[in-house]
Amino acid sequence: MKSIVVLFDEKNKYEEEKVFSDKSAKELCLSAAESFGFEVRTISGLSTISELLEELDKICSESGAESLIFSYADCLFLNKTLTQGLLSTHFDYKAEYTFAEGYPEGFAPEVLDKGTIAILKELSKTTAKATGDQKITRHSLMDIIKTDINSFEVETVLAPVDWRLFRFAFDCRKKETFIACQKLYESGISNEDAVELSEYAAKSAEILKTVPAFYNLQLAQKCQGQCTYCPYPAELLKKEGVKACEAAKVMSFDNACKLIDQIADFSGEAVVGLSAWGECFNNPDLLKIIEKILSYEGLSVLI
């Protein structure tokens, strides 16, 4: 049965970095995809799930492929053996959508029947339009399928150990995952063994802890709330002799900007929380601080 491999290229800033034995993640991913033995196409320039499905349906029609193997162009650890297992399960059980569960993200592609793609394309424009209009993410195909999941024959290839709790993502979409890829590649373990790679990653401090993805900033001492289990008022009174509801100190805009600049430089992509202790709305420069955070493409705000 004819299949085709499609890699979606997000054009992220790290995928072209030649740090993997003088090769980039994009080059290694393409090489891995070509080892599957099928035609490989790389697509880009799409923004919504609906647009993605439209393009995938078009590719199936043009190529005459009965099934489509989908992944992202920066997944340098794309695994041939795992992919073969997915295809075997997909065809043996006549599945419409097959994916790997429990393995780190970036090791396995997703497999779809061409008819499933056509159906999802229509769903993304009609009953599931709200999902279809969403920006493409690494979970887009599953997200659109979940809108009517009982209508599809979905099969799963399970990992021998559930590594999901580690939240691994071996791709190069951001600095955090890019560094993890570098450290895993430096281990020298063959890409052919997804289990050995996963076991190594789960024990490697360099992979588990790359750069922070979340920061908490306290913008104001004052807090009008009276939470039964909150230790903040008692500790503030003990250390500084002031009640939380009467505290007056706030972080200056200049100091906040310095911290935000350092966060952006160090982590690249991160969530900045503004509700560590105290009530951030007591800082008169709150809106300016939020604007400063959002001036960096890789930073977002949590209040």
Task: For the regions a language model picked out, list residue spans one by one.
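Conserved nucleotide-sugar donor-binding
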Residues: F107-E122, K175-T177
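Short beta-strand-to-loop acidic/aromatic patch adjacent to the donor-nucleotide binding site
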Residues: A65-L76
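Conserved alpha-helical substructure of the radical SAM core
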Residues: A205-I303
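N-terminal glycine-rich phosphate-binding loop and ensuing alpha1 helix
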Residues: M1-S44
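Active-site nucleotide-sugar/metal-binding loop of Leloir-type enzymes
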Residues: E51-S67
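Basic phosphate/pyrophosphate-binding loop/patch that engages nucleotide-derived ligands
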Residues: G85-E96, T116-I136, T147
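Conserved donor-nucleotide/metal-binding helix-loop-beta segment in metal-dependent transferases, i.e.
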Residues: L76-E105
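Conserved alpha/beta core of the MobA/IspD/sugar-nucleotide pyrophosphorylase nucleotidyltransferase superfamily
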Residues: T137-P212
